[in-house]
């Protein structure tokens, strides 16, 4: 067990994670006394705490996370908010089932804070960081699914290249994939630093804005956790769970996530989905969301200085409308 994991067990409320775009998230969620809210990605708990304080004395939060360490943190925090914070171990791909199992429907607001928490990134045993030596794992839930090492050591060069290009937008995808396949023929690739060194070798001595392994690690993490599929499922279910007037807020950290969220919001806010040029609407589509953020909200320079992790964050928000358009 890593030192960080041991400390987390001794003090579940200890965290290095600072919630991103907290003020904007609260503004768009607009928590109120007696409201019911879902934090679909509890993480360090910063957003949930703020929602609980803003919805005092009787607002409730269903705190969902796939990471058992985050759920332990939520259970510890729940003792400070008896009857108001409901910890839940699960993936937001099952959002509707989880909410219904708690009788937590309909709801007044749902927050998705996507990507990694600082605690996950800082724990070498989790295998998310290319700067810290650890096993090639990358699972949000270490008790479920296969680690990244399985992909790295069993997928073909063609499959790896497609993965790095599709989920990492990595321009050197094919060269990196070939290098991985050649290296694993000599010895298994089992650690984060081992993989990062291989990728850096392909990049050579060129100086880049980001570490050469950034995109490869992103692609592997997305694949291991099926993040985009989970996000698409979670967003679709979130709309169903919201009462009219309820708010949906999503914070994304890379272009693939943000693009998916933007397209989903636009589709759900559109009055018609017929192909351009169709003389009369025949699709029967009725909008279910009203956009609150025509453009994504970005962190201020001050927040980026204080919390560099927030640099790539993009927040989008929408409001559930009734079928009659109100």
Curated annotation (Swiss-Prot):
Region span, Disordered: 299-326
SUPFAM superfamilies on file: Putative methyltransferase TM0872, insert domain, S-adenosyl-L-methionine-dependent methyltransferases
Record field: compositional bias (Basic and acidic residues): 316-326
Keywords for this protein: Cytoplasm, Methyltransferase, rRNA processing, S-adenosyl-L-methionine, Transferase
EC number: 2.1.1.199
Compartment(s) of residence: Cytoplasm
Reaction catalysis annotation: cytidine(1402) in 16S rRNA + S-adenosyl-L-methionine = N(4)-methylcytidine(1402) in 16S rRNA + S-adenosyl-L-homocysteine + H(+)
Domain of life: Bacteria
EC primary class: transferase
Keyword Cytoplasm: yes
GO biological process: rRNA base methylation
Molecular function in Gene Ontology: rRNA (cytosine-N4-)-methyltransferase activity
Cited Pfam families: Methyltransf_5
Disulfide bonds: none
Amino acids binding S-adenosyl-L-methionine: 45-47, 65, 113, 120
One GO CC annotation: cytoplasm
UniProt main location, coarse: cytoplasm
InterPro entries: RsmH (IPR002903), SAM-dep_MeTrfase_MraW_recog (IPR023397), SAM-dependent_MTases_sf (IPR029063)
Listed NCBIfam families: 16S rRNA (cytosine(1402)-N(4))-methyltransferase RsmH (TIGR00006)
Alphabetized HAMAP family for the sequence: 16SrRNA_methyltr_H
Purpose of the protein: Specifically methylates the N4 position of cytidine in position 1402 (C1402) of 16S rRNA.
Family to which the UniProt record says this protein belongs: Belongs to the methyltransferase superfamily. RsmH family.
Protein name from the UniProt record: Ribosomal RNA small subunit methyltransferase H
